[in-house]
């Protein structure tokens, strides 16, 4: 529209007094061969004088306008060519992006997502299995810890029993030692009593022998000297008394010895039985202690093995969980990158579509402008010979006042394939 206004202003500069009209056609009317368009349809010429000196100025102005319009058309053609090249380039990029988009769609990202989901499900399943195994191992560890605590309690109880048995055994040994000492003391006493009995018997025998010798000497002396009283009965009586006393003492000593020996024998037997029982119990406790020690060592080894296996399982579980987390993060990053790339391609495609739409609109606008300019320029060239210039008589009063009024009417007709598409009319008033 600016170019049209500039052209109209340029035309206004060389149009003389009067009216210039561009003949128009009715919309939809087709031009046949040999049809001439009248650019200015004037009223019938009045009997006046025609000034042909204005034709040269009009021709020069028209040529200048034609040159400027030709330069503008060349510039527009260059710009139009560059736009066409740009449009072709963008269309090629659009086709390439569309092909890439179709290729990406043909890859069926849903199946890829299904594959990722299947792999994620498998990884989650393995993670759940590892978690279950870890929980099971923890339960087994707790059970073994409870068993170990029970065994340790039993070991403590057995240790206490062993200590008690050892204390009892020490007491029994002390009692046995005391009984042995008492037995030895009694044996020494018995030996001393036996020696004393033997000594007393020996003394008694010597006394009896001495008495017998004395009795024999006295009897002989009595027999020799005089008849003395009978001492044999007295000696026999004394002898009988002494023998009875010795026998009684011997019997009492033997009875006392037998009773003491029986008591000591019974005490020794009891102590020996208790000692044997204590030794048997100590041996049983020792065997139980050895068995429990072996069980404890076995359980300790089993516990250490299970703890080592549990640590290995936990470390492997941590490593596998870390690898699964890394794989999951990597898959999520790949999915996110694919989504971002897809969004970027879609955004680029949308931008290219917007650019293409804008270029299509601009091309259509330029095409319409070019067609309008071509139609507008072609009509005056073809009908330049039909221009009719007339000079009207001016009012004396108006001339004397030094003012000249001009009415310029510009009628533009747009044609395509010989058909009138658009017709416009502009009227300008100028005072000189």
Curated annotation (Swiss-Prot):
- Residues with the modification Citrulline, per the entry, are 30, 36, 270, 406, 416
Residue numbers spanned by region Coil 1A: 73-104
Domain IF rod: from-to ranges: 69-377
Biological process terms from the Gene Ontology for this record are: astrocyte development; Bergmann glial cell differentiation; D-aspartate import across plasma membrane; extracellular matrix organization; gene expression; intermediate filament organization; intracellular protein transport; long-term synaptic potentiation
Gene Ontology CC: one annotated term: cytoplasm
Q: Could you tell me which residues belong to the region Linker 12?
A: 215-230
Q: Where is this region: Linker 1?
A: 105-115
Q: Outline the segment boundaries, as ranges, of region: Coil 1B.
A: 116-214
Give the residue ranges for region: Linker 2: 253-256
Where is the PTM Phosphoserine found along the chain?
13, 38, 82, 323, 385
Q: Which InterPro entries match?
A: IF_conserved, IF_rod_dom, Intermed_filament_DNA-bd, Intermediate_filament
Record's subcellular location: Cytoplasm
Modifications the protein undergoes after translation, according to the UniProt entry:
Phosphorylated by PKN1.
**Modification type Omega-N-methylarginine: residues:** 12
Q: Which UniProt keywords apply?
A: Citrullination, Coiled coil, Cytoplasm, Disease variant, Intermediate filament, Leukodystrophy, Methylation, Phosphoprotein
Asked if Coiled coil is a keyword of the record, the answer is yes
Major localisation:
cytoplasm
Disease / disorder? Alexander disease: A rare disorder of the central nervous system. The most common form affects infants and young children, and is characterized by progressive failure of central myelination, usually leading to death within the first decade. Infants with Alexander disease develop a leukodystrophy with macrocephaly, seizures, and psychomotor retardation. Patients with juvenile or adult forms typically experience ataxia, bulbar signs and spasticity, and a more slowly progressive course.
Q: What is this protein called?
A: Glial fibrillary acidic protein
Species of origin = Homo sapiens (Human)
Lineage of the native species?
Answer: Eukaryota, Metazoa, Chordata, Craniata, Vertebrata
Encoding gene per record: GFAP
């Amino acid at each position: 529209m600016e170019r049209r206004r500039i052209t109209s202003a340029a035309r206004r500069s060389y149009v003389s007094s009067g009216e210039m009209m561009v003949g128009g056609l009715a919309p939809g009317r087709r031009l046949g061969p040999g049809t001439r368009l009248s650019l200015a349809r004037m009223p019938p010429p009045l009997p006046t004088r025609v000034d042909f000196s204005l034709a040269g100025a009009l021709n020069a102005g028209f040529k200048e306008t034609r040159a400027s319009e030709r330069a503008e058309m060349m510039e527009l053609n260059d710009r139009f060519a560059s736009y066409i090249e740009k449009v072709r380039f963008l269309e090629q990029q659009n086709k390439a992006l569309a092909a890439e988009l179709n290729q990406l769609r043909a890859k069926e990202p849903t199946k890829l997502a299904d594959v990722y989901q299947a792999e994620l499900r498998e990884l989650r399943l393995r993670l759940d299995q590892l978690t279950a195994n870890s929980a099971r191992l923890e339960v087994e560890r707790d059970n073994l810890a409870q068993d170990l605590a029970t065994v340790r309690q039993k070991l403590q109880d057995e240790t206490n029993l062993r200590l008690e048995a050892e204390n009892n055994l020490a007491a029994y040994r002390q009692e046995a030692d005391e009984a042995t000492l008492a037995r030895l003391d009694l044996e020494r006493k018995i030996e001393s009593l036996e020696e004393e009995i033997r000594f007393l018997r020996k003394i008694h025998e010597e006394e009896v022998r001495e008495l017998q010798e004395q009795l024999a000497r006295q009897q002989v002396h009595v027999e020799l000297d005089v008849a003395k009283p009978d001492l044999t009965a007295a000696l026999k009586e004394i002898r009988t008394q002494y023998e009875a006393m010795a026998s009684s003492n011997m019997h009492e000593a033997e009875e006392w010895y037998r009773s003491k020996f029986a008591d000591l024998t019974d005490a020794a037997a009891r102590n020996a039985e208790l000692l044997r029982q204590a030794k048997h119990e100590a041996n049983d406790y020792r065997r139980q202690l050895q068995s429990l020690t072996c069980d404890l060592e076995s359980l300790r080894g089993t516990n250490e093995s299970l703890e080592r296996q549990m640590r290995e399982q936990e470390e492997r579980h941590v490593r596998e969980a870390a690898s699964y987390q890394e794989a999951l993060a990597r898959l999520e990053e790949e999915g996110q990158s694919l989504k971002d790339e897809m969004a970027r391609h879609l955004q680029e495609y949308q931008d290219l579509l917007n650019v293409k739409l804008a270029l299509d609109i601009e091309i259509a606008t330029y095409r319409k402008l070019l067609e309008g300019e071509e139609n507008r320029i072609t009509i005056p060239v073809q009908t330049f010979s039909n221009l009719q210039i007339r000079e009207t008589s001016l009012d004396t009063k108006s001339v004397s006042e030094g003012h000249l009024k001009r009415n310029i009417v510009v009628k533009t007709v747009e044609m395509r394939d010989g058909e009138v598409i658009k017709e416009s009319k502009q009227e300008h008033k100028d005072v000189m």
